[in-house]
């Protein structure tokens, strides 16, 4: 099933998202080989940069947030942002962005077919699609990189419970 707006997904970051990624694999070639073998049979995590973000827009949709917008906009309509962390972690510079944008102004970006635009719920502290707009995918993530949908949070313990996935584009 393809990710929908509002879904919280786990995905493998594209090259631009991986500049700070450091492999957890051992530098010892024997241990590294064992880790790879265990990963192949799902007994160890894969050696990739898996990230968690909320889907905001899907292929063919236009996403943006400009001065005066009441929220992040998809196809010219504001999305529901009730799930966004408030108060924000960091202040927003009003000369370059807004609270409703969760940081700097951006877009418009047309999401390529087969890709998704993702944003963190902690908008002012999230290096999400907005911070990768100069890469070959314009900050979007190929749906093929999605590993699954987040259903439950175990940690931190003060957030343990199910994950809401509201239709953030509902009018």
For each predicted feature, which ranges?
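Soluble "head" domains of membrane/secretory-pathway proteins
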Residues: 1-171
């Amino acid at each position: 099933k393809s990710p929908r707006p509002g879904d919280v997904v786990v995905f493998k970051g594209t090259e631009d998202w991986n500049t700070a990624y450091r492999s957890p694999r051992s530098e010892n070639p024997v241990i590294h080989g064992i880790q790879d073998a265990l990963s192949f049979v799902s007994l160890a995590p894969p050696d990739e940069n898996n990230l968690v973000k909320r889907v905001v827009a899907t292929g063919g949709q236009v996403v943006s947030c400009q001065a005066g917008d009441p929220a992040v906009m998809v196809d010219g309509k504001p999305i529901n942002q009730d799930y966004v962390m408030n108060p924000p972690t960091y202040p927003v510079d009003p000369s370059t962005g807004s609270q409703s944008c969760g940081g700097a102004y951006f877009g418009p970006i047309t999401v390529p077919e087969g890709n998704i635009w993702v944003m963190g719920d902690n908008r002012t502290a999230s290096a999400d699609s907005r911070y990768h707009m100069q890469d070959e995918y314009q900050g979007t993530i190929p749906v093929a990189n999605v590993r699954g949908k987040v259903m439950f949070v175990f940690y931190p313990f003060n957030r343990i419970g199910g994950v809401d996935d509201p239709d953030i584009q509902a009018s």
